[in-house]
Amino acid sequence: MSSDDTTDPTADDESFTDSPVAGLEQSTTTRGSGRTVISARNINVWYNETQALSDITMDIPEQEVTALIGPSGCGKSTFLRCINRMNDRIDACRIEGELELHGKNVYDEDVDPVALRRKVGMVFQKPNPFPKSIYDNVAYGLKIQGYDGDIDARVEEALRGAALWDEVNDQLDESGLELSGGQQQRLCIARAIAPDPEVVLMDEPTSALDPVAASKVEDLIDELVEDYTVVIVTHNMQQAARISDKTAVFLTGGELVEFDDTASVFENPSSERVENYITGKFG
């Protein structure tokens, strides 16, 4: 659902019938249950007196990839961090509205942010493995959460899920910091999925990687969505078109001006503002 916009972003315009990204490879996979897992209603966020998000309303579907795109400073990362309450750590941040995970407002007083983050994992822009062994990077969260299952088996499962096991299974005692950048990011993904969350948030996870490593992470995202709901922030239009099922377009002022199937957003943008952004005329 799009927020209000003076240009009426839901209006059809024949001038946008030609795809602004002609020839761009796009995801054609149909997946997901169709159920809503995350529901945002009238989310407004301020940092002190500066408003970062303005009246954001959207429903994120289960077991699909939802891409958040927009120019720098438009609030997409702020919205991502609302989902697992990472913004709680910023004293100057104030949030209004409701953000529900399976119908439960994550900002209710009885919600433990730590427990929430077990259900909503996160992968950051730059790989940030712990200064520990590869094994301990993945096992650490399980141990502090009191996981009573087979930790060795879960570590292997997470590393396989992150497409890393075959590369590191004979060096689990070595430091995660010794891995390549792309391997480190996949290690961070393994760490994020080890507690078996429902949602995986990714804040520009390939922006610090070379093209080959970035491609491996994209392939991995396509596999992860079989088990998890993925929400990814990206500045890369081609990446959003390739890997996502839904795309949300944020523009300056923290407005959500379009949220629709990715093919629709790129082939038939609903407003001139959106077309100008995705074709590189601004942003």
Swiss-Prot record:
What InterPro entries does this protein's entry cite?
AAA+_ATPase, ABC_transporter-like_ATP-bd, ABC_transporter-like_CS, P-loop_NTPase, PstB-like
Q: Which family does it belong to?
A: Belongs to the ABC transporter superfamily. Phosphate importer (TC 3.A.1.7) family.
Q: Which PROSITE patterns match?
A: ABC_TRANSPORTER_1, ABC_TRANSPORTER_2, PSTB
* Localization, UniProt: Cell membrane
Pfam families referenced in this protein's UniProt entry, alphabetically: ABC_tran
Q: Which UniProt keywords apply?
A: ATP-binding, Cell membrane, Membrane, Nucleotide-binding, Phosphate transport, Translocase, Transport
Reaction equation(s) it catalyzes: phosphate(out) + ATP + H2O = ADP + 2 phosphate(in) + H(+)
Give yes or no: UniProt keyword Translocase: yes
Q: What is this entry's stated membrane topology?
A: Peripheral membrane protein
Q: What biological-process terms (Gene Ontology) are attached?
A: phosphate ion transmembrane transport
For this UniProt entry, what is the primary localization, expressed as one broad class?
membrane
Gene source species = Natronomonas pharaonis (strain ATCC 35678 / DSM 2160 / CIP 103997 / JCM 8858 / NBRC 14720 / NCIMB 2260 / Gabara) (Halobacterium pharaonis)
Q: What is this protein called?
A: Phosphate import ATP-binding protein PstB 1
Q: Which SMART domains match?
A: AAA
Q: Which SUPFAM superfamilies match?
A: P-loop containing nucleoside triphosphate hydrolases (SSF52540)
